[in-house]
Amino acid sequence: MSNRKYFGTDGVRGKVGDTPITPDFVLKLGWAAGKVLARHGSRKIIIGKDTRISGYMLESALEAGLAAAGLSASFTGPMPTPAVAYLTRTFRAEAGIVISASHNPYYDNGIKFFSIDGTKLPDEVEEAIEAELEKPLTCVESAELGKASRIVDAAGRYIEFCKGTFPSELSLNGLKIVVDCANGATYHIAPSVLRELGAKVIAIGCEPDGMNINEECGATDVRQLQARVLAEKADVGLAFDGDGDRLIMVDHLGNKVDGDQILYIIAREGLRQGQLRGGAVGTLMSNMGLEVALKQLGIPFARAKVGDRYVLEMMQAKGWRIGAENSGHVILLDKTTTGDGVIAGLQVLTAIVRNHMSLHDLCSGMKLFPQILVNVRFTGENDPLEDKKVQQITQDVEKELAGRGRVLLRKSGTEPLIRVMVEGEHEETVIALANRIADAVKAAG
């Protein structure tokens, strides 16, 4: 990916009120995107958002920019990111735009784009939009201005799509499920999907006020969900993040079930049903326990760079259909085109119902290795990762683990930090080894 001024790996993102997340810039972004997409024959764009208070402001700015470029916008209202990808496909729109900062606090927001097939825009299109941003804004003739409309029952359409990924011969009758929607975009989606499939649903995190999105709730903080699952004696808990593309689960004992475990369950069930095509893709941060468990099942496993974009790229390159990050991004290409928390949850619930097993028991075939992450701040000019002593100690630790553990050193993309990750079978050993490497990194930095 070339150097860019505004687009990151997940669109344009930042703090509301600071460039680039300002009304004037987003208007210009809408215009620039409109000009580029119009060259590809575009005339209709789908726009969705999560529940942040700033979404209304940014939505209006995007609409004005697109209209000035001659493109019409259809609005979904608050909807999960994967729902916008789905609606972009079904409405044959030329692109979809989501106003969201995913799992970030309410004072952040972002703009990300989907192409006509529901996948993220190609790099070259994003680069063309950046180039257009450098030009002065011009408006098309009045007769060519874009129009605005709302999609009738966007939520109902997406609810039916989600339900369609659950086997028609099964139901969730008899299951008590707690669902935490992070006061985000799934608040009016996930509870309805689960209830209509027969579950008894206890919903939390479903009262968005524009500022409580992801606040001590949802996939990034499952403590409320864990407590409620235990208090209600529920069978299972599901937690989504603010824009609904992540899923973390909780079993009936209150244990957290992360993206690695969810990927294991879905891969194992796919194998049992004869529906698994190829292997599974994780990331450099995926727990080694996942790799070991899949190997025991004879399922190939590959690691992509951290980021759902890179997971998807590797899946497409290998022709594989399932992949996930341990943070809860689960991509199931046989079901949809992007990470979808609700649909991922339904696939795990399918395994629970079909096998008459609890979530806890479905996870039992995979043992999570103790994983220790130490962040080391460095301020010197020297790169600690290039230091000979750091490299030697890292090699020594890898030899000591003898194939029953992993070492990963990587730089943070946002701070002057080296992240030291060590995992292995015994926690005390892992802690000692991680600290040994961290001390060497500190000395080098």
Swiss-Prot record:
Q: Name one GO cellular component term.
A: cytosol
Catalysis: reaction(s): alpha-D-glucosamine 1-phosphate = D-glucosamine 6-phosphate
List of residues that carry Phosphoserine: 102
Query: Which EC class is this protein assigned?
Result: isomerase
- Provide this UniProt record's keywords sorted from A to Z: Isomerase, Magnesium, Metal-binding, Phosphoprotein
Whether rRNA-binding counts among this entry's keywords is no
Keyword Oxidoreductase found: no
Extract the InterPro entries matched here: A-D-PHexomutase_a/b/a-I, A-D-PHexomutase_a/b/a-I/II/III, A-D-PHexomutase_a/b/a-II, A-D-PHexomutase_a/b/a-III, A-D-PHexomutase_C, A-D-PHexomutase_C_sf, A-D-PHexomutase_CS, Alpha-D-phosphohexomutase_SF
Superkingdom, according to UniProt? Bacteria
Describe the processing and modification events after translation.
Activated by phosphorylation.
EC number(s) in its UniProt entry? 5.4.2.10
GO BP term, example: UDP-N-acetylglucosamine biosynthetic process
GO MF entries: magnesium ion binding; phosphoglucosamine mutase activity; phosphomannomutase activity
Active-site residues per Swiss-Prot or TrEMBL entry: 102
Binding residues for Mg(2+), per the UniProt record? 102, 241, 243, 245
List required co-factors. Mg(2+)
Note describing how the cofactor binds: Binds 1 Mg(2+) ion per subunit.
A Pfam match: PGM_PMM_II
* Function statement: Catalyzes the conversion of glucosamine-6-phosphate to glucosamine-1-phosphate.
PANTHER family the UniProt entry points to: PHOSPHOGLUCOMUTASE (ALPHA-D-GLUCOSE-1,6-BISPHOSPHATE-DEPENDENT), PHOSPHOHEXOSE MUTASE
Stated family = Belongs to the phosphohexose mutase family.
| Protein name (database record) | Phosphoglucosamine mutase
Organism in which the protein naturally occurs: Pectobacterium carotovorum subsp. carotovorum (strain PC1)
